Amino acid sequence: MSVMGEDALVPRARSRLPVMCAAGLGFLTLAVAWLLDSDKFSERAGIIAFGLMLERFIYCICLLAEELLFHSRQRYHGRMSEIFRACFRGSGILGMCAIFLMLMLGGVSFSVKQWSHFNLMCAGYMLLNSLGVLGPAPVEISEICEAKKMNVAHGLAWSFYIGYLKFLLPALEVNVREYSRRERLSSPRLHILLPLNARVPSKPEEEDTNVVFHENLPDLKLDRAGVRKRSYTNSVYKITHNNETFSCILEYATPLLTLYQMSQESSAGFGERERKQQVLLFYRTLSQILDNSLECRNRYRLILLNDEHTGDPHYLSRELFQNLKQQDGEIFMDPTNEVHPVPEEGPVGNCNGALQATFHEEPMSDEPTLMFSRPQSLRSEPVETTDYFNPSSAMKQN
């Protein structure tokens, strides 16, 4: 579910723009180099490319030494093929060998001076890499973690969905239907609050006195992970705003408690800035998961709460009021209620919910017959001649 103003807060997935820019600048610099000195350009470019790939290959050998000596059994079960795939890229090795063969077949002879240049390039690469100068930038690390779904937020979002929302939301619909027989709910959906600062109070009344606990829905009891009849409870709250009172099912996203407590532990290496980014990623990931879930579709509402509301004691009730008002204009489709066609009046009948027309059937003749129609001009306008649509013919029959 979308929340008003979320585009200004929730980060979008990163695009391929850096790769495209790097490729464009690479071709541009190659063109400039060729214009400056076109003498043996392909030979010099091949030698430089071979040197760059060689230094990366030597660094991968250093990675291989670590994996072979200390991690071959625990991480790879002694399988050398997996160790090599983890340390080397097949495309890099093939590219280096292909460039070397092309240079040799092209008649290029590597002199002692050129090998000395290769040694200096490899030495400089090793030293700079060991000092962290050539390491990935924070943006690159973030991009890799997001692309591989390796962030804390990804795990928490999937855990919240698989371990709670996936089975709770379909079952909650039954409780809401029973509750609505005796009391009115402003919305049948579960409203999940996600504060950006990850500070989750034990009671919403602590944040806003206009949000008051009303009562609990009947418990949902399931056998989960060895616990017999584990109880899951949802609460109904009354929200007052501008002398209007609304009621809805409300709760905070409990995984945000984990993010907040991690930021308080020095061993977690999780600062306030990282915590906010993880909350936004949690919101984005959970939204994508729930949007693609048939069990949860149209049964929830994610409400992202901006923490820039210091001094407003009724911020929460105002946000809930706006979301509930926004839902008033939406059509809530109950997937359990099937829509049946309405039968038309007249010769059209209804059989098991399907429209069925009745026509007068005549016995078919075995003798072939010829049917002729009156000739019409090819340029004439089409005229409806059936009795149903032609009032003149209908009047003649009457």
UniProtKB/Swiss-Prot annotation:
Residues 150-331 are annotated as: Cyclic dinucleotide-binding domain (CBD). Pfam families: STING_LBD, STING_TM. Residues 387-398 have a biased composition (Polar residues). GO terms for cellular component: autophagosome; autophagosome membrane; cytoplasmic vesicle; endoplasmic reticulum; endoplasmic reticulum membrane; endoplasmic reticulum-Golgi intermediate compartment membrane; Golgi membrane; perinuclear region of cytoplasm. Phosphorylation by TBK1 leads to activation and production of IFN-beta. Following cyclic nucleotide (c-di-GMP or cGAMP)-binding, activation and translocation from the endoplasmic reticulum, STING1 is phosphorylated by tbk1, leading to recruitment of the transcription factor irf3 to induce type-I interferons and other cytokines. Residues 375-398 are annotated as: Disordered. It catalyses: H(+)(in) = H(+)(out). Residues 38-44, 113-120 are lumenal. It is a multi-pass membrane protein. GO terms for biological process: activation of innate immune response; autophagosome assembly; cGAS/STING signaling pathway; cytoplasmic pattern recognition receptor signaling pathway; defense response to virus; innate immune response; positive regulation of defense response to virus by host; positive regulation of macroautophagy. Residues 1-16, 66-91, 142-398 are cytoplasmic. The chain crosses the membrane at residues 17-37, 45-65, 92-112, 121-141. Keywords: Cytoplasm, Cytoplasmic vesicle, Endoplasmic reticulum, Golgi apparatus, Immunity, Innate immunity, Ion channel, Ion transport, Isopeptide bond, Membrane, Nucleotide-binding, Phosphoprotein, Transmembrane, Transmembrane helix, Transport. 3',3'-c-di-GMP binds at S159, Y164, R230, S231, Y232, T233, T254. Gene3D superfamilies: 1.20.5.5200, Stimulator of interferon genes protein. CDD domains: STING_C_metazoan-like (cd22658). 2',3'-cGAMP binds at S159, Y164, R230, T254. In absence of cGAMP, the transmembrane and cytoplasmic regions interact to form an integrated, domain-swapped dimeric assembly. In absence of cyclic nucleotide (c-di-GMP or cGAMP), the protein is autoinhibited by an intramolecular interaction between the cyclic dinucleotide-binding domain (CBD) and the C-terminal tail (CTT). Following cGAMP-binding, the cyclic dinucleotide-binding domain (CBD) is closed, leading to a 180 degrees rotation of the CBD domain relative to the transmembrane domain. The N-terminal domain interacts with glycerophospholipids and phospholipids. Homodimer; forms a homodimer in absence of cyclic nucleotide (c-di-GMP or cGAMP). Homotetramer; in presence of cyclic nucleotide (c-di-GMP or cGAMP), forms tetramers and higher-order oligomers through side-by-side packing. Interacts (when phosphorylated) with irf3; following activation and phosphorylation by tbk1, recruits irf3. This is Stimulator of interferon genes protein. It comes from Danio rerio.
